[in-house]
C-alpha cells in the first residue's frame, strides 16, 4: 500500500512479514543504518532471538523470487479480478462487508447463526468456518471468505447465492 501511494520514502521502518501470505516464517525490516544499529544493540527481543535456520532463508529466497515472476504477476492480476467480482456480487445481494482485500469479512453478529450457517454451507460443499466470540468482540461473529486466483467466477457466484440464502433463512 505504501508503494502504491508513493510513501516509501516517508516510512522509517518498512516491515515485510513472510508468514501466512508469504508461506513462510520471519520478516524483513528495511530502515536507515543508524536505526538498524540501534535495534541490533538495544532491542532485548532481538538480542535474545536466535537466527532462522538456513533452510528458512533458502525458502524465503525461493518465495521472493517466485513473487517477482511473470507467473505470479498474472496470478495477482487474476486475484484482483476475483476480489472486485466478489465485492460487486456481495453488494448486489445486499451482503455488507468493509473488506477490500482477498480476505473478505461478512459479519453476522451471532455465534449461533455462524455455527448453523457454516454447517449448512459445509454440507453444500463449501469449506468455511466462522470466527466467533471470544476470538472477535461480542456480537461481531463473522465469516472470513478467502479468495485465490484459482476459484472460478461461477463458483464465487454460486457461493454468494448460497451464503445469501443462509443469511436470510437461518433464525
Briefly describe each language-model feature range.
Residues 25-26, 43-52:
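A short glycine-threonine-serine/GTX helix/turn-capping micro-motif
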Residues 57-74, 91:
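Amphipathic alpha-helix from the class-I
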Amino acid at each position: 500500500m505504501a508503494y502504491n501511494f508513493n510513501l516509501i520514502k516517508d516510512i522509517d521502518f518498512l516491515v515485510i512479514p513472510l508468514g501466512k501470505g508469504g508461506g513462510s516464517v520471519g520478516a524483513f525490516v528495511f530502515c536507515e543504518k543508524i536505526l538498524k544499529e540501534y535495534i541490533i544493540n538495544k532491542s532485548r527481543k532481538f538480542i535474545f532471538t536466535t537466527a532462522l535456520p538456513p533452510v528458512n532463508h533458502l525458502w524465503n529466497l525461493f518465495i521472493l523470487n517466485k513473487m517477482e515472476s511473470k507467473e505470479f504477476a498474472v496470478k495477482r492480476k487474476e486475484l484482483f479480478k476475483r476480489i472486485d467480482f466478489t465485492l460487486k456480487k456481495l453488494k448486489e445481494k445486499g451482503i455488507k462487508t468493509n473488506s477490500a482485500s482477498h480476505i473478505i469479512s461478512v459479519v453476522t453478529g451471532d455465534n449461533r447463526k455462524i455455527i448453523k450457517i457454516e454447517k449448512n454451507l459445509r454440507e453444500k460443499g463449501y469449506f468455511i468456518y466462522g470466527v466467533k466470540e471470544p476470538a472477535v468482540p461480542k456480537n461481531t461473529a463473522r465469516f472470513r471468505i478467502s479468495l485465490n486466483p484459482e476459484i472460478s467466477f461461477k463458483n464465487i457466484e454460486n457461493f454468494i447465492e448460497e451464503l445469501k440464502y443462509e443469511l436470510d433463512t437461518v433464525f
